[in-house]
């Protein structure tokens, strides 16, 4: 089993361009697994962890409701935002500057074949990262992602998640609000969940801006420990 994970920082990149990039890696990995099974070979698959910041964009998962986008195409353009229907799980979410967006493209045959465990460990990596900033975050029953003050009228989401998997290969991932402009969430019903607020790390800490690279380093440390991975930086 290959537990090496190649970490790639893509910088600020258009959503569609990044999605295509993910799809190419995903397809190569799935195709190699099919070839190995068909030909009886054991060529190792590779694992990747992509990090990116997107320009303002809304994405709707395959089980989502387009009615959860609350603005018109004209209003989208006025806000310099785009909209895509995509092939991950979940409903609608927002990506933009000030978020850490992570796309692990892993062959879970290299780790464990359990999608539920995969999602819970991704959540745990975020929870442990936020705890380093003194924030107590947690899961909300039946709602994937990471939240604060669950079970109270003040419950708010700080990290959204939505993934796709085929033949135990994953793509898509999570978006952690660090310095994000939360006003963009007013244009959607985030994750299709009415009456729940969103927040970001800088708002919770009362700081103007938090270093994204520092947060990413902490997150990768916890990911490495939880997945027992070997990180390789590109």
Swiss-Prot record:
Reaction(s) catalysed (UniProt annotation): octanoyl-[ACP] + L-lysyl-[protein] = N(6)-octanoyl-L-lysyl-[protein] + holo-[ACP] + H(+)
PANTHER family named among the record's database cross-references: OCTANOYLTRANSFERASE
UniProt miscellaneous comment: In the reaction, the free carboxyl group of octanoic acid is attached via an amide linkage to the epsilon-amino group of a specific lysine residue of lipoyl domains of lipoate-dependent enzymes.
Keyword ATP-binding listed: no
Binding site for substrate: 88-95, 160-162, 173-175
GO biological process: one example: protein modification process
Family designation: Belongs to the LipB family.
UniProt xrefs under CDD domains: LipB (cd16444)
An example molecular function term from Gene Ontology annotations: lipoyl(octanoyl) transferase activity
NCBIfam families named in the record: lipB, PRK14345.1
SUPFAM superfamilies: Class II aaRS and biotin synthetases (SSF55681)
Function noted in UniProt: Catalyzes the transfer of endogenously produced octanoic acid from octanoyl-acyl-carrier-protein onto the lipoyl domains of lipoate-dependent enzymes. Lipoyl-ACP can also act as a substrate although octanoyl-ACP is likely to be the physiological substrate.
GO cellular component, one term: cytoplasm
Pathway the protein contributes to: Protein modification; protein lipoylation via endogenous pathway; protein N(6)-(lipoyl)lysine from octanoyl-[acyl-carrier-protein]: step 1/2
Location of the protein in the cell: Cytoplasm
Active site as annotated: 191 (acyl-thioester intermediate)
PROSITE patterns for the chain: BPL_LPL_CATALYTIC (PS51733), LIPB (PS01313)
Phylogenetic placement of the source organism: Bacteria, Pseudomonadati, Bacteroidota, Flavobacteriia, Flavobacteriales
Site (Lowers pKa of active site Cys): 157
Assigned EC number: 2.3.1.181
Residue ranges annotated for the BPL/LPL catalytic domain, each copy included: 43-231
Chief place where the protein resides: cytoplasm
Protein's organism: Christiangramia forsetii (strain DSM 17595 / CGMCC 1.15422 / KT0803)
Name assigned to this protein: Octanoyltransferase
Keywords: Acyltransferase, Cytoplasm, Transferase
Presence of the UniProt keyword Magnesium in the record: no
One Pfam family this sequence matches: LplA-B_cat
